[in-house]
Amino acid sequence: AGFDPAFIVLSPLDLSVDSIYNRGADIALQIRRMAFTERSGLTVSDMTGDIGMDASGISLAGVTLKAPFSRIEANISAGEGILALAPDSPLKADLMADVNTKDLKYLYPALIPPVLDGRIVSLALTAAGTLGDIGKAGLDISSPGHVAFTADGAARNVLDPGRMEASARFEGDFRDMAFLEALLSDSALR
């Protein structure tokens, strides 16, 4: 059936929180362990990290999520204007993931065709600057034996499409792309 955000059921839920702080709009949560299986079948075997929101902004520090075949790590901080999409809001993100399509299949079964079943995709994303001017961004995507792709760059006036400027450098090593043929319908692209 897949994941339905309107009907989330976690069972069983194993949750260990070191501390919770809440005062007005300020929230801080230190998750020492969280494990669950969602109704779709996706299992999170371990999640840890610190989550916070206060007058200075929002942060995820040392957040690690492990599923049976996947792992995601995130460190993200954003200034107080991030929710209002303020262009001058500071932004820093560092995200690393090794995702196996076996885990993704529980969320969106139709998204993973048989040719992609059991495929590992590694991703590293970094960004620093403000929401309006990303001074430095990087993206690395790879799938062992198939593709290794790197992009880095910067963008200015991101929230103003009429004034937006961006520069990027791309590099890729596409070793075995035969699986793409199975993903394309019978068309001129094939």
What are these regions (language model features)?
Residues A1-R190:
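Interface amphipathic segments
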